[in-house]
């Protein structure tokens, strides 16, 4: 069974058009979705995490259609935002406790798992590492990275949660190369 299945999933609203996304991802697999703009990458990440609903097509997380059953789909997903998670050590602990309550997890075990995950990632002050540790507190089936700055995050996540499917978005800006002597070309 696929963990994430996109079938011609498209998002279009107020001038933004992202898609179509058309792929399937199984447990333990990784996929990178490449876009020309950061905004498109963020929208695609949110589509894959059931935060944004597709305008057309379908996107399933497990058996759940993200348009019809977003709460059920979201319980299977860990989302790592491009901005990461800023704040003090205390703010991180409070966020872990809050999420543990929302997910119905034991708070002490969630705190321990978050600290262990953060230590395994290696940089306790990095906002993106903190967001990744927070996303991995519950045992999610799908982990979605919104534009990770470094490939080590995906590698660490795959080591920590090898059965978790991983989607990451990336931005590769294309450039038009114009020769220096372009203006000197004669007709």
Question: Where do the protein language model's features map onto the residues?
Answer:
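Q-loop/switch helix immediately C-terminal to the Walker
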Residues: 76-79, 83, 88-106, 113-117
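Helix-to-loop junction immediately C-terminal to a conserved catalytic motif
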Residues: 49
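ABC transporter nucleotide-binding domains
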Residues: 43, 72-78
């Amino acid at each position: 069974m696929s963990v994430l299945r996109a079938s011609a999933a498209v998002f279009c609203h107020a001038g933004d058009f992202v898609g179509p996304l058309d792929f399937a991802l199984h447990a333990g697999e990784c996929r990178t979705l490449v876009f020309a703009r950061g905004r498109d990458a963020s929208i695609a990440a949110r589509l894959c995490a059931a935060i944004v609903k597709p305008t057309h097509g379908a996107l399933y997380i497990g058996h759940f259609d993200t348009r019809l059953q977003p709460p059920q789909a979201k319980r299977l997903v860990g989302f790592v935002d491009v901005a990461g998670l800023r704040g003090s050590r205390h703010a991180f602990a409070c966020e872990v406790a809050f999420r543990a309550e929302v997910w119905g997890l034991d708070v002490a075990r969630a705190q321990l798992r978050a600290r262990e995950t953060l230590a395994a990632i290696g940089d306790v002050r990095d906002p993106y590492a903190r967001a990744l540790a927070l996303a991995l507190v519950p045992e999610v089936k799908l982990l979605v990275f919104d534009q990770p700055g470094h490939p080590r995050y995906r590698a660490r996540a795959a080591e920590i949660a090898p059965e978790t499917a991983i989607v990451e978005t990336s931005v590769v800006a294309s450039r038009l190369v114009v020769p220096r002597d372009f203006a000197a070309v004669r007709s």
